[in-house]
Amino acid sequence: MAWKIPAPDAVHWPAAPSWSGWWRALMLSCSAVVMAGCGIYFWLHDSRALVYAFAGVVVLILLFAGIAGWWMYRYGVLLEHADGTTQYNAMLEAQWQRWAQEGMVVSGVSTLFPEQVRTPQDSGEPVSTLAPLRLPECPGSTYLFTELLAPLRVALQIFIRNQSLTVCLPESASEDDWQCFWSVWAALSLPLSAIQLSEMKPEPFSRQMTLWQQKDAVRTGWLIIRHNWTPGSEGTQGAVAWLLSHPDIRTGLRPCATLHRVFPTDNTLPDGDLRQFLQYQCVSNTMKGVWSDAVTQPHISRLMVALSQQHKAVAEQGEATVIPPVSPVQQYLPHWLGEMKDGETWFAVTQVIQMAEHTRETQVLALAKGSEAFLMSVSSGGDNVA
């Protein structure tokens, strides 16, 4: 699973030259040559012995200087190569970090949940129940779309002034549902010419996010509507609407949050995945809240340990960083949304978006109870790189 990011090139730092042994060898060699020359001179009384001894010492010194120069040159080349490799690895890491922190800007969120579902803006404790929370019987698609679009009416009017908008209804939407959407859209005095229709395909959430982040999706915004409000639906019922756009689009709206690139993993949250997630999605290092479900909750402690190690490593490198004064607040999704089944991922991400917008702080979601397992950072505002 995880991101397919290539490993950095190996860096081989050369050992610094050690001259102590060579220096002793030079001194011993020179001393031996001088003593030999002096001995021959006193034995044979031949002054040429002193000349030869002096020449031998000079040759030894020049030989030592040549070897030392070659060693210093080789050491400098290897040191420069290691430093260049380090800088190249740092450049690649920065590029992958920018890639990992790309995301979609959330310009508006509308929700429809049972009264027991507490939003971050509400006071009081979460519901603390594992039972599914139910809505009254749905009066119809017209009521559903009206309740979701009415709070977003002003944001939609501003958004579609200069940008087109692609509307994505659930894959189960019928022709009658589309007709109801058209009628509600027109009733809110929104121009029909500004929107494009797109049926929401049954893609996993991470795959859907990847499709929205592709370059050909930059030309349009996205109105996403998902709900779990049918007679046969299981788990907590509700409905959500998101107004998404690519960071390159100027919408004229104040961003609520940024959904950063999804990190695919498995249910056990392997340590290697946690380290890679924190290393490349750097905005997660400033998290003030971490959300988990029944599957990932037992593994959150290892995420906290990995986060602490990441902060320690950055501090040892002497790099500037924003270290939270306290550990991130742990949020348990069933305490907010009850027992979830259908629409679990969309409802969970919606809660995290609302918390990031309310606290103006980064939140991290670890979700694995649904059809896929992933980690994702949700930062406040529209800054998609920490």
State each model region's role.
Residues 237:
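Phosphate-binding/switch region of NTP-binding enzymes
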